[in-house]
Amino acid sequence: AFRFEAAEGRLQKIPSVSTIPDSIQERTGFSTAEIAIHPSGKFLYVSNRGHDSIALFGINEQSGKLSLKSVEPTRCQTPRHFVIAPGGKRLYAAGQASGTITAFTIDSKTGRLSFNKRILKVPKPVCIVFSRPISSTPKKP
């Protein structure tokens, strides 16, 4: 992990952290995939393939240091990608191997995820994107 030193215009290396709880010893086949920072800038989320979870880290505003807060099961297999919805209140995880998208509510104070008990069947989802509505009226030059 790195912290950007704006005054000097350089990156400073900061210690790496595990995205899997220390209690998990066997990690064969585990890898991280998506990384996203909550719009508040206070929380960082990382998806874990193999462990099928999303790790939540708190971000220290002064040092940029990460501290593991929780690891939430995604309730889908191989969470290749996830997205934080505009507004920062929801997170959606794409389970490539399970063919599902699962939904979570984000606690605005703690960043913790709560499963919404919503599972959408989709053939091999690998990415979720929110976009703005497309206007049918052309813009004037």
Tell me the role of every PLM-derived stretch:
Residues 1-141:
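Feature marking well-ordered beta-strand scaffolds used for ligand recognition
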